[in-house]
Structure formats: C-alpha cells, structure tokens
Amino acid sequence: MDNDGGAPPPPPTLVVEEPKKAEIRGVAFKELFRFADGLDYVLMGIGSVGAFVHGCSLPLFLRFFADLVNSFGSNSNNVEKMMEEVLKYALYFLVVGAAIWASSWAEISCWMWSGERQTTKMRIKYLEAALNQDIQFFDTEVRTSDVVFAINTDAVMVQDAISEKLGNFIHYMATFVSGFIVGFTAVWQLALVTLAVVPLIAVIGGIHTTTLSKLSNKSQESLSQAGNIVEQTVVQIRVVMAFVGESRASQAYSSALKIAQKLGYKTGLAKGMGLGATYFVVFCCYALLLWYGGYLVRHHLTNGGLAIATMFAVMIGGLALGQSAPSMAAFAKAKVAAAKIFRIIDHKPTIERNSESGVELDSVTGLVELKNVDFSYPSRPDVKILNNFCLSVPAGKTIALVGSSGSGKSTVVSLIERFYDPNSGQVLLDGQDLKTLKLRWLRQQIGLVSQEPALFATSIKENILLGRPDADQVEIEEAARVANAHSFIIKLPDGFDTQVGERGLQLSGGQKQRIAIARAMLKNPAILLLDEATSALDSESEKLVQEALDRFMIGRTTLIIAHRLSTIRKADLVAVLQQGSVSEIGTHDELFSKGENGVYAKLIKMQEAAHETAMSNARKSSARPSSARNSVSSPIMTRNSSYGRSPYSRRLSDFSTSDFSLSIDASSYPNYRNEKLAFKDQANSFWRLAKMNSPEWKYALLGSVGSVICGSLSAFFAYVLSAVLSVYYNPDHEYMIKQIDKYCYLLIGLSSAALVFNTLQHSFWDIVGENLTKRVREKMLSAVLKNEMAWFDQEENESARIAARLALDANNVRSAIGDRISVIVQNTALMLVACTAGFVLQWRLALVLVAVFPVVVAATVLQKMFMTGFSGDLEAAHAKGTQLAGEAIANVRTVAAFNSEAKIVRLYTANLEPPLKRCFWKGQIAGSGYGVAQFCLYASYALGLWYASWLVKHGISDFSKTIRVFMVLMVSANGAAETLTLAPDFIKGGQAMRSVFELLDRKTEIEPDDPDTTPVPDRLRGEVELKHIDFSYPSRPDIQIFRDLSLRARAGKTLALVGPSGCGKSSVISLIQRFYEPSSGRVMIDGKDIRKYNLKAIRKHIAIVPQEPCLFGTTIYENIAYGHECATEAEIIQAATLASAHKFISALPEGYKTYVGERGVQLSGGQKQRIAIARALVRKAEIMLLDEATSALDAESERSVQEALDQACSGRTSIVVAHRLSTIRNAHVIAVIDDGKVAEQGSHSHLLKNHPDGIYARMIQLQRFTHTQVIGMTSGSSSRVKEDDA
C-alpha cells in the first residue's frame, strides 16, 4: 500500500480542528421572545411602561425648566412673583424625581426578572432539544463545548439583550420621541428642521450596528474555538502533563485568542467612528438649530424660553438616539447567539426520540434481524462500514460477534439501538421494522452495557437508577449484588450515596463497569447488548460478573461483542465480521471444525500459538500445570475496551462534592464568589492589573486624551447652549446675530472634535482592553497548567468550569478595567470642567450644587452594596447546571439508550431554580437603589434652582450667570450618576479580579518547572524504584491506597503489575509520573529522588500508553506528533507502522490528515489505541509505562503491536499493567499488589514455584479453569489442540 496516506501537515501544535461552519445569520428580533409566557408579557408590559415613563421624564423636566427660565426672564422686575414661580417648578421637579423613582424600579426589576425567566426556559428547551437529537447530529454538527458555550455565553447574550438592554432601548427611544414631542409643541419650526437630519443619524446608527454585529459574530466563533482548546486540554490533562504539552496548549490557545484580539481592535475602531459620526451629526444639527432659533426669536415667532425648551428637548432626544446604539449592538449579538441556540431547538432529528408515532408490540419474543443492511457513518459517508450485511439473532438466544477492530461490531449495536438508520436494508424486531416502532418503547426493551462505562457526576445510586427511575432501594441493591458491585459499594464511606466524580473518575474501570451492568440489570430488558461488558475487569471480578451475566441472559436475546473465549464460550452462535459483512456464522464447534479454511479457526490458532509460547516459557521452570494468561481467558478478537478503565483514575480516593440533589447548597460554591471583596484588596488587585497592562501605557494615554476631550465637549456644549439662552434675551439684534454666529462656528468645531476624539478614545481603549484580556487569559491558562493533579480532582476545577472561568473572568475584568475606565475618565473630565466653570461664574450656587452630589453618591453606593450580595453566587449556580449539561451531551449515547433525557432535564431545571429566585430579589433591590439615586438627583436640581432664585432676589447674582452655572453642573451631575451606575460592572470586575489573582497566586504543590532542581542528563539508565511508599489521594486522606509499598524496576528490564481491580496498579504509574506525591517514602529514578529532578525534563524521558486512548480533536498526524514535537514525517510514519496503524490510516480518504473528532470519536477503540501507541513510540523514551496497552486490539493487531512494543521496550525500562499473560510473559519481574502493598514478587516461574497457593497462582488457576472449558469445547473438532495448552 502507498506510504503517503495523505501528505502530513507540519509539526504539531495543539490546534483543535473542526468542520467548517456556515456563517450564522441572526434570527428576527421578535424571535428572541419565543419563550415568553403570560407572566413574562405582563412583566415586560410593566417594565416597558416603567422604561417609557423613565425615558419621558427628562424632556418633561426640560419643558418645566424652560417655563422656569421664562419666569426668570419675564419677572426680573417682580422678584416676589419670580420666587413663587420658581418654588412651584421646584415642586414639579420633585414630582418628576418621584416618577423616576417608581418607573426606574419597574423598569429594572421587571426586565431583569423577565429576562432571567425567559432564558431559564430557553436553556431548558435547548438542553431538551439537544438531548432529543439523533446521534449523527453529534457526530457531524455539534461538539460538547458548543453546548457548554451556548448554555453559558450565548444564553447570557440573549438574556442581556431581552432584559437590561431592551429596557434601556425603550427608555432612550422614549426620551428621543418625547424630546421631539416637547420640541414640536414648543416651536414646531425648530423641531421640523431637526427632524430633517434624524434619518442621517439613523443611517449612521444602522451602518454602525451592522458592522459591530459582523465583527461580534466572528469574535464569538474564535473565542468558542479558544474555549474548546482549554476544555480539551483540561479534560485530557493527564496526557498533556505526561507528554509535557503544557506549552503547546498555551501556544494553541494564544493563537486562537490572537484572532479574537485583532477582531477586538476592529470593533473598537468601528465603535469609535460610529459614535463619533453620531455626535458629529448631532452637534452640527444643534448649530443649525441655534442659528434658526435666533432667527425665530428676532422675528417674534417664539421667545427664548420656548426656543431653548425645543433645543434642550431635541439635544436630549438626539443624544438618547446615540445612547441606544449599545442596545442595538447587544440586539445584533443576541440575534446571532439566539440563532445558534434556536438552530438546535428547531432542528428536527431524522430519528425522532419523543415521537408518539409508531407501534408498541404487545409482547416481545426478541427475534432481531438485520437484512441486506448497507451503512456508512454520516461523518464519513465515503467509508462503508456495513455492506449488504445480514444477521439473524433467534429469540432468547445468544450470539457473539467477533472480528477485527473497525469491522463494524459496535455499529451493529448502534443500529439495533436505532442510534442510526441504515442507508439501505432493514433492522427488524419480531418481524417489525424498527422504524415502525415507537422509539422510547423500543429502547425500554433493550439493555446496553457498552465498553465505555459512561457514568455521571452524581451518586452511585443515581447512576444505577438511570436503568429504571422508579426502582426502590431493595431493587437497586439487588441489581448491584448480581453485578458483583454491592461488596465494594458498601465498603465506601458513603455507600450508595458516594459521588463518582466527573465521568466516574473516582472509581476504577472495573468498578465503573460493574455499576453500568447493575444499571442495565435494573432495566430488566428483553434484549441485552453487551459491548465488551467485562473487558475492564480483573480475573476474579470477571468470573463473578460473567456468571451474573450468564444468569441474567437466560431467556433474553443477547448480542455479545467480545474478544475473550470465556465470554463467548456459551454463545449459541458466533458470527465473524470481516470488511462489513458476516464472513462466517455458526456454533463455536462448527466454525472451529473448518480448520485452515475458516477465519474463526485461524484466529483461535493464532491465540493458541501465543499460549504455546507463554507455556513453554513457564514449563521450563515449573512442572505445575498452569493457565497461560493473566486474564480470565484468551482474547479472540480484540474490540474497543478503550474506555474500560481510566489509566490515571483515582481509586476511590476522593469523592466529588458534585451533587444531583434538587437543592443547591450555596456553601458548596467556591468562596471567592460569595465573599465581599475588601476595598484594599480590590485596590491592590487593580494596581496589579494596571501593571499587567503597562506595555499599553501609550495607548491608554492616547485613549485618555480622547476620553478627557470627549468629556469636556459635553460641558462646553452645555455652556454654549446656556450662553445662547442669555443672548436670546438681549434686545440688540445686531449683537445677537454676531454672538449666535460665533457660537454656531464653535459648535461645528466641537462636532469635528467629537468625531476625531471618540474614534481615538474607543480605538485605543479597546486595544488596551483586548491586550489585557488576552494577557489575563494566557496567564490564567499557564497558572491552571502549573497546578498539581490533585487540584484538577476538585469539583470546581472541572473542565467546563475552567473554560467558562477563563472566558468570563477575563471578560469581566476587561469590562470593569478597560471599557469602564474610559467612561470614568470621560465623566471625571466632564465634572472637572463643569465644576471649574461653575465656581468661576458663581461660586455660591456651584458650592450648593456640588454639596448635594454626595447624597447621590451615597444612594448609588447603597445600590452597589445590595448588588454584591445578590450577584455573588449566580455564576456558580449556573456553572453547576452547565457541568451537568456538558456531561449529558458527552454521554449522549448512554442518555439515549436509557431514555434518561427527561431525568437529565429535570435535574438541570432544578439547578436553574435558585438563580431565578435570587434574580427576582436582586432586581427589586437594584431597581429601588437606582430610583433613590435618581430622586436625589432631581431633588438637588430643585434645591439648586430655588437657591438660584434666592441669589437673584437678593441681588447677589444675575439671571445669565445662574442659568449657566446650573446648566453646566446639571450636565456634570448626569455624568456622575452615569459613572456610579457602572457599579454592577465594577462588582463583577472586582470578583473577577479576585478570581484571577487567586488562580495566578496559587502556589502549586508540585512545581513542574523548578529552575533550582537537578538537571536531567540527556540519557537516563532508567532504573525506577518506589521505597516504603504510603499514599492516599489528597482529597480523601482517610482512604489509604498504599502502605509501605516497595517496588523496583531495574534499568532496561520489564516490571509487570498485576492485582485485583482497584488495588492501585495505576496509582503506581501516577506516582512515577509524579502526578501526586506519596505521604511518606520516595520514588526514585536512577537512584535519585524524583523530587530533585526538574519535573518537565524528567517527564520527557517517560512515555505512557494509557488503556483509555485520549486523543485530541485534531488530525491523526498531530495526535501522533504530540508524543515528540520535533518528530519528522518519516519518524511519525515509522511509529504508526510499528503500532500497526499505518495501514488503516493510509486507507482513509484523507490519510494522516483525517480529523479524529472530539476525543477521537470518529475512530474505533482499536484504532484510537494504535494511535496512542504510535504517540508513545515516537517519543523514544528510556522509561515506558504501558497500562493495558494492547487490550483494545484484535488478535492480529495485538500480536504485531506486542512484537513492536517488545522491540521498542528492548533496552528500556518498562512498567506494564496487564490482565493478559501474553502481555507479561516475558516480564523480568511480576509484582502482585494487594491490600496496599506488594504481596508477591518474582518472575512468572518463580511465583508459581515458590508461592503455589499465592494470589498469582490462584489467578492462573482461575484462568486455567475457564480456558480449559473453552478448549474442551474445541477438542472434538480438532486434534491439533494440545491438552496442556490450557
């Protein structure tokens, strides 16, 4: 076969590839509210009224203000009447303030709660719809990280748009409209002129929004990609650490962030130019209005008060249109985010899970038939898996499927479960096509135990209950007893309530598999599908479970995928699959009797040859007859047992606090979310972030210049308008014309400055913000990857949460620090300019107005305090739901097989209830706090105007000065209020800063790259020794794994570890890789304590082949190259050839460039394992750690790969965890681990000779017994099988 199975790409970085996606178009705006119910419409109605009244209040206030100006102007000779009028209008101001108090409460509380209610329903519907999709949808369309991203980030975007931003939009549009109404009723000519320029503002706003929407869409895609890299890295953290891939993960993450960063720069420029253009048009419009207003006053068509009312109203209305732009940008983002969510919700699966159509059979006899089935996986339609496939499983009988890895055995199981429909042909149950049967009913009749025991991060009891949710405790315990799980469960501190951790990692593979079997038994199905059901069990457990399965199978139609003879010895029929069709079918005896002409017989001969070799070695030193394999029996054809046991999984060592109970205990959330951030800490964190941002000081300086000038423009603008007001009352028309012309030119100058400096402000502050975000995210990932393994074992550091934390914390920090500082600088400049002008013109009035500012500040700070308490743990509560959703999608086949969709959705719904309740109270308090602050503001206006009239009455000041001071300071007070309404962002930013620095400051228990350690020589001898090791996993110190364990692997020799499931074999491998530190004792390499070496450097001399082949979602080439980043193409092909992988890779349409899918789902288990072996071989390390390295391979591959491994391990120190004797027959030393220490140690022959009644001998006896039974079945058919081969 041609050697180039697709030209491989250049050397690897961990870039996660994915199928190209079409650009997503946003949904219609009204579609955002598709989950609103009656109460939501009521809330939105009240919220809209509140927002409308709130928005109208300012133009109404301006109308009163204009009337007051006229009172000043027309009553200058009658001070008593003037005081009376002013007092009346001051009371009107208080009424407006009270209206704002009530309306802002209604606006904020109703929109906030309605938004949370609607998005809660949307999240639930999304998960429901995602779980309702057929399996092919997850193969081709959606990754787990997409679901996590949608539920986390996209849903938050939609919520932001349909709550706060929509309230703001109605508020600003009400201001805009009411401003024009006030204008038209005051001076319609002036208002009409203004109306002529509004379309121009709208066009600019439209272009601005469209541009931001496109950029936002692209940015979200690149951030989603970055999040996927983080999630894959953390999920496979053991592989990343073992192969020293931390820097590669960081580089890949950095590359993905760079794309988002550049898009962020463009967004800043677009935002600045859009806002600048809006202000340019608005200011030019007012220049025109001032000139035209003067014309109308001179011609006695209006007076100064009405003219100024129109201008003020139009000014506020026009600015409100600009202020609505961020809301429009949020709508654009939300429409795109909603499109992604609704695409899943609206997607009709090809195979409808919840359809009520289809029949339910009265009784099931269990005849299963596949007739002329052709099938290709939707993700690879050009690769045919089944070709004119025919198979009949008689009712109540057991059929075993054997065949090479990738021959289609698991595909048959998938078709019977109706995860897929065949391309052509039929799958029948009792003569009925599966397509005509009700799907939920069909799956209720089928019990599935797959080779990958998928457990959820809940209790053992809840995991078993997935089989039948209405079962009682007695039935649960009985199922566990029959599955040989009861004995180990009751020894656990929490028994059946023990938490199994994310993906069941708290349990050994064998323990997980027994729980999966108990789950299937509880279902009591008519048809049983066993896909390598006992592959992850040690000899003793396998024998007990197999006996339980044998009892369980009686009277049920059973289809077994297996590679061990013991597993299939009692099958009524054996079907041999080859190249997508059944090449042989018959009983074991019939197939074996074909001899040389039969595929099955050849396979058994191959196995027997392996036994012969093992036995001849054993017989040289021991006359004692023994079974020749360390597993219960010999494999016939290896199938994917790849997920049978996590090679690195902790052995019942720490139990996650994750909890599927319906109540959420706030105390279980990370403390940093609940604690209030002390001001000192916050200030300290702020300065640290500022230092982190120091390379951008030039950009920050230029951005600040933009902010200062943009802020000052507002004060100048107010001054120009108040100056014109006094000019309007001047009787000298020539003077009026000259002054108005001067101020109009000044306004045109201000409009040009607004265009330039808005662009400057937003462009440069966005560069500062984007660089900070990228830097914070990179540092956070580096800090995450420096932590020791025990940190990753904690529930709050689960992969989806870390990905979300990197995304949200960095964003919140950027929001608070980058975006908001720009606004603060702008408003500070505004206040300074305004206060200076006020004090210069009339210091007494300025002093009174400035004196009431603290009241406003106090009111807003009160709101800030309440916001802290109520926003604290919302993110954590959502994180729990997000984790559950991610697990459900990752294990979607298990969820589907057990009809558990409704249960998962119920648990998810329960997780969303607490944040919903808290959001209600948060809205009440935030709304009231904001209302109080606004009321105080208007009360201060009333006080200021009353005092101004008092000053005029007593001759201390005149009308012209007081009105200028009042207007300039009124504008600055609005700026102060706007600054303080940013409090929620600073609270989020403060919490995020705490979270960021908590992560960055954490001192790892095991430093991976300590410069003070001893350098590792270029070549090691490779001697490994564990001396007097005591060990417990850090999270459960009360469960001791090892007690005074001592082991030694001599340089260049092979040490095999055997023992019952859960005895700590894989813990030895974890200690050698220094994932954990022993409680006492030492792990030595070449006679030196491993702690003295640089950890990353020593790991470069160790290669691992885990039983669970963890692959990254990239190409085959890059997965192999992950073993050695400098490997050449020739070395990669050589490693693949040695691992028996080159042939199947070359046969794929894209060869080495084939995308393997998330966690390698596009490949069979055997194929994944061979790639994992190639990855280890390309490393050329002195120490090889093989954890069931060949367990997932078929007989032919196993033999060639075992030879390759023997050859590769030659001269290298090898530590092998194995169940099969063929894997360890040549081991120099076999160590039997039991009860936390080495119970027996020596070569195979030594153990049998010196410990005839020992544990190892008993295991051999057990295998001998089962194997003899199998051989007994074949002896009638073939004289070539020797008796002593058993």
Curated annotation (Swiss-Prot):
Keywords on record: ATP-binding, Auxin signaling pathway, Brassinosteroid signaling pathway, Cell membrane, Glycoprotein, Membrane, Nucleotide-binding, Repeat, Transmembrane, Transmembrane helix, Transport
Reactions catalysed: (indol-3-yl)acetate(in) + ATP + H2O = (indol-3-yl)acetate(out) + ADP + phosphate + H(+); brassinolide(in) + ATP + H2O = brassinolide(out) + ADP + phosphate + H(+); 24-epi-brassinolide(in) + ATP + H2O = 24-epi-brassinolide(out) + ADP + phosphate + H(+); 24-epi-castasterone(in) + ATP + H2O = 24-epi-castasterone(out) + ADP + phosphate + H(+)
Low complexity bias: start-end ranges: 616-635
Region (Disordered): 614-647
Effect caused by changing residue 61 to A: Reduced brassinolide-triggered ATPase activity and altered brassinosteroid exporter activity
Pfam family, one: ABC_tran
PROSITE patterns linked to this entry: ABC_TM1F, ABC_TRANSPORTER_1, ABC_TRANSPORTER_2
An example Gene Ontology CC term for this record: endoplasmic reticulum
Domain ABC transmembrane type-1 residue range list: 44-333, 700-988
Disulfide bond annotation, renumbered to this chain: none
Region (Interaction with FKBP42/TWD1): 1049-1286
Molecular-function annotations in GO: ABC-type transporter activity; ATP binding; ATP hydrolysis activity; ATPase-coupled transmembrane transporter activity; auxin efflux transmembrane transporter activity; auxin influx transmembrane transporter activity
Residues where brassinolide binds: 286, 941, 978
Compartments where found: Cell membrane
Subunit structure, as described in the record: Interacts with 1-naphthylphthalamic acid (NPA) and FKBP42/TWD1.
The protein's name in its UniProt record: ABC transporter B family member 1
Organism: Arabidopsis thaliana
High-level lineage: Eukaryota, Viridiplantae, Streptophyta, Embryophyta, Tracheophyta
Gene (name only): ABCB1
